[in-house]
Amino acid sequence: IGPMLIDRYAFTLVESGNMALGMSLISLFSPAFFGRIDPGPARRRAWMANFSLLVAALYLCVGLVHHATLNLALVVCIAVLSGYSVLQYSDVRSSYPPDLTGRALSVFTMAMFLGVGLVQSLTGWVADWAQGLGLEPYRAVMATIAALLALGSIAFRWLPASPLLQHPGVQGKDLA
């Protein structure tokens, strides 16, 4: 976000840093908020898919809209809404029997870091490609992130749910 604010709107390093700090502070608390409003195993997967589509739309708007105040508001919304990702941990916990939960959470965490690395690599390539064509890189990067989130949401909807989510009483009390 910092480089985009500097390149698009001539923000100073301090101004863009303040925005990054604000986003970081919001990101500290938004997962706790989503943890408190977790709808439970029956509706959690739909929430995750829908929030990822909403965040995808916000990223697309950041890429397409060239208005500093609106982009700042969109980025703050992304920071607030990205707390929904904590629901994925609850979903993993609810999807595996207690003796496999630790391993499942470890695999999920490693897969998430792999995904972050792949997206960073891909968006770096997209930015270079866009610049080579004389296009604004931030538009291409934000559109790519939006497309990846939308594709991920669609794939998640098609993945079969765990049988434990269909019969939550099998595992005992849902602590997620």
Locate each region found by the language model.
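Hydrophobic core of transmembrane alpha-helices in multi-pass small-molecule transporters
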Residues: 69-86
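Intracellular juxtamembrane helix-capping segments at the cytosolic ends
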Residues: 83-97
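Structural signature of the two symmetry-related core transmembrane helices
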Residues: 45-60
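Helix-to-loop junctions at the C-terminal end of transmembrane segments
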Residues: 30-43, 127
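A membrane-interface helix-boundary motif in multi-pass transporters
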Residues: 12, 125-147
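Multi-pass alpha-helical transporter architecture, strongest
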Residues: 63, 143-176
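A late C-terminal transmembrane helix in Major Facilitator Superfamily
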Residues: 98-131
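Short amphipathic helix-loop junctions that connect adjacent transmembrane helices
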Residues: 1-15, 128
